Design a protein with these regions (language model features):
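Hinge/beta->alpha junction and helix N-cap segments in small-molecule ligand-binding domains
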Residues: 2-24, 28-51, 68-72, 94-96, ...
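Short, well-ordered coil/turn elements that cap or connect secondary structure elements
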Residues: 31-33, 85, 105-106
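Short, well-ordered amphipathic alpha-helices
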Residues: 20-25, 75-80, 128
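Hydrophobic alpha-helical
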Residues: 41-99
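Hinge/cleft segment of the Venus flytrap/periplasmic-binding protein
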Residues: 115-160
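Short, glycine/charged-rich beta-strand-loop motifs at protein surfaces that mediate ligand recognition
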Residues: 88-89, 110-116
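Hydrophobic structural packing positions in well-ordered secondary structure
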Residues: 2-3, 23, 103, 127, ...
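Glycine-rich, charge-decorated loop segments at or immediately adjacent to ligand/cofactor-binding or catalytic sites
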Residues: 97-108
Length: 160
């Protein structure tokens, strides 16, 4: 399995790390036989990313699954599309237009929608409760996610 992640100093790193830890817990309970390989892609270095992916797939031609723990699953899907390759499963985050297009073509298997509007609303509400109403704030607020696939992506946007 290929795992793509941000450099550690990225501001989204904490949320991504927590998502990865949950994924690894699931893997340890359900799929102990999976081998995980890390690759760090850089947002602005398309050529470097291509070289890293070339080297990875040359060294690990048996890789069949991929998980991208940030919003750039489209980079991997585009790379695979250009190479005429496809993974048995490729999962990513966020409903960027590029990501949803690759989801619709089947080159991305699942996208995890994190409901950013709801997250923003809850953040402002919590801030208001704390600052204006002097109410205590919880350190962690669990939020719902949506698991989307090509069969339900069009319906999802109808109800936003």
């Amino acid at each position: 399995m290929l795992r793509l992640r941000n450099p550690e100093n990225n501001p989204a790193g904490i949320q991504m790390r927590l998502g990865f830890e949950g994924f690894m817990q699931y893997r340890s309970e359900e799929h102990k036989d999976w081998t995980i390989h890390d690759i760090v892609l850089h947002k602005e270095d398309t050529d470097g990313n291509r070289r890293m992916l070339d080297a990875f797939f040359k060294e690990h031609p048996q890789a069949v699954l991929g998980a991208v723990f940030n919003s750039r699953v489209y980079q991997v899907a585009n790379y695979l599309h250009e190479k005429g390759q496809k993974l048995a499963g490729l999962v990513g985050y966020d409903l960027l237009h590029k990501n949803t297009e690759f989801l619709k073509t089947g080159e991305v298997t699942f996208l995890i929608g994190q409901r950013p509007g709801l997250q923003g609303y809850c953040g402002v509400k919590t801030l208001c409760n704390h600052v204006v109403f002097k109410r205590p704030v919880t350190a962690v607020k669990y939020m719902p996610i949506d698991i989307l696939m090509k069969e339900n992506i069009d319906f999802y946007f109808e109800f936003e």
